[in-house]
C-alpha cells in the first residue's frame, strides 16, 4: 500500500508539531522518519495510523482519501517502543489476539500463529509469558502480533529504543530481513542515524515539524540538502565564517562542513595544508579519533583507520598539517 501525505499540519494548542508536510511513500518500501526530539516524526506516524487527525491536509492510502478513517478501517499494524504485550497471556495468545477479535476460525489462527513464530524466530517459545522473555524477544512478539492480521501498513514508533545497544543492532538486521520476506509497507520512527542508515530504503529527515530531505541513505549522507541534514547525519566539523570571493568581486560568508573521515592528516606540509596541533587521541577500537586545534583556536575532529594512525606515529601536542578530502559549504547555518 502506498501512502501519500498532502500539505498535512497538526498543532497541539499553540505548538505546531507538523507543518505543511508533503510526502510520498512507495508501496512495499521500508521508510525511516528520522529527526531529533520534537521534530514531529512521532506525530506524523500517529497521523498516518489514524491515532491523530490533521488540522489541515489529506492522507491517502493507495490513492484513496483516508484522512478521517479509523485505525481499524485503515488496516494498519502499530508497534510501540514499550512492547505493550498482555502480561497474563502467553506468546501464542498475544500473537493470536487480533485474529480472535476478528473471529477468525481456530484452525486458521493456529496456523497463522505457527507461521509467525517461525518468521520472528520464536518457534518453541509460544507457551512462555512475556516476563520469561528477553527485551528483544518481547519486541519480536509485538511485531508478530502486529503482522498477524496482515496489515497493509506496518508502523513502528522507535521499536528498539528501550533495548541495549547490542540487541538493537541485532534486531535492526533482523527487521531488514523480515521486511524483505513480507514486503509490507513499513514506516518506522527513530532518532538514531545509524539505525535509519542501516535499515531503511528511504530516509525522511525531519526538523521542527517539517521535512528537510527525503532520499536513500547514500543520498542523504553524500548530498545533504541543508546544514541541518549535514549536521544531523553523522559527526561533522563546522568551520565558521570563512570568506570566499565571488566572481563579481564581492565576498560571502560560508560555513564549511567537514566529515571527520574527510580530513587528511600529514606530518609535514604538503600542498594546501593547514597547520594544526593534536589536542587529544581517542582509540575507538575500529578507528582512531584525533582532536585537533587550528592556529586560530577552532577545533576539529578527524577519524583515521588504525593502519593510517600507526603509519603516522601521532602523539598529543604534536604539530600536524591537515587538508580536506571533501568539504561542503552552505551560505547560512542553523543549529540542531
UniProtKB/Swiss-Prot annotation:
Report the EC number(s), separated by commas if there are several. 7.3.2.3
What keyword terms does UniProt attach to this protein? ATP-binding, Cell inner membrane, Cell membrane, Membrane, Nucleotide-binding, Sulfate transport, Translocase, Transport
Q: Which residues form the ABC transporter domain?
A: 3-233
Q: What is its main location?
A: membrane
Topology class, membrane: Peripheral membrane protein
Q: Where in the cell is it found?
A: Cell inner membrane
Disulfide pairings:
none
Residues that hold ATP according to the record: 35-42
Q: Which GO terms describe its cellular component?
A: ATP-binding cassette (ABC) transporter complex
Example of a GO MF term? ATP hydrolysis activity
The record ties this protein, via CDD domains, to: ABC_CysA_sulfate_importer (cd03296)
* Catalysed conversion reaction: sulfate(out) + ATP + H2O = sulfate(in) + ADP + phosphate + H(+); thiosulfate(out) + ATP + H2O = thiosulfate(in) + ADP + phosphate + H(+)
Q: What does this protein do?
A: Part of the ABC transporter complex CysAWTP involved in sulfate/thiosulfate import. Responsible for energy coupling to the transport system.
Which family does the entry's similarity section mention?
Answer: Belongs to the ABC transporter superfamily. Sulfate/tungstate importer (TC 3.A.1.6) family.
Name assigned to this protein: Sulfate/thiosulfate import ATP-binding protein CysA
> What is the species listed in this Swiss-Prot or TrEMBL entry?
Thermosynechococcus vestitus (strain NIES-2133 / IAM M-273 / BP-1)
